[in-house]
């Protein structure tokens, strides 16, 4: 991430997916995070596609949270159960979307990164499938290796 220095603002850094070659980050001091435009990284483009859908899923979760807070006043058991069911389905959608995204983008280093950061506790078969479908170059990358190590560590811990 790119850090603008010491400030009281919550948008002190710009997260981006770096790769070899020339990259360009343009922004303003007033909107350091929100106005950032990043170019020169194919992985960043792919990551931004993922983040758009993740943002939509987060919005759905916030809507459920709002309903839950409102329901805390009336304490309607049916509404509570409905909210919990919707949240469970949303969690499943998030996991499936994330896994599918990683599986259909095996040529990008961002795929194992997303698997590691978004669904590290997913079913081992799913993580293993993601790892095995990675392009050989990606499998040898930092996050490809970390994903493989994470799967091995989880297998060891689950066997004990």
Each model region followed by its residue ranges:
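A non-transmembrane, solvent-exposed segment enriched in polar/low-complexity residues
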Residues: 1-82
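A generic structural micro-environment signature
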Residues: 22-24, 31, 89, 125, ...
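An accessory alpha-helical subdomain
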Residues: 65-101, 112, 118
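Charged, long alpha-helical assembly modules
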Residues: 96-160
């Amino acid at each position: 991430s790119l850090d603008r220095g010491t400030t009281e603002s919550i948008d002190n850094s710009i997260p981006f997916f770096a790769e070899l070659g020339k990259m360009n980050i343009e922004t303003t001091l007033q909107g350091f995070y929100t106005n950032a435009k990043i170019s020169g990284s194919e992985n960043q483009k792919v990551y931004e596609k993922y983040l758009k859908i993740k943002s939509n899923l987060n919005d759905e979760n916030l809507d459920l949270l709002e309903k839950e807070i409102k329901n805390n006043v009336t304490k309607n058991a049916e509404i509570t159960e409905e909210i919990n069911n919707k949240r469970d389905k949303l969690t499943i959608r998030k996991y499936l979307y994330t896994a599918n995204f990683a599986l259909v983008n095996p040529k990008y280093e961002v795929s194992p990164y997303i698997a590691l950061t978004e669904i590290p506790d997913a079913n081992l078969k799913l993580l293993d499938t993601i790892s095995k479908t990675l392009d050989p170059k990606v499998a040898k990358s930092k996050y490809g290796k970390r994903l493989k190590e994470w799967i091995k560590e989880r297998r060891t811990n689950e066997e004990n």
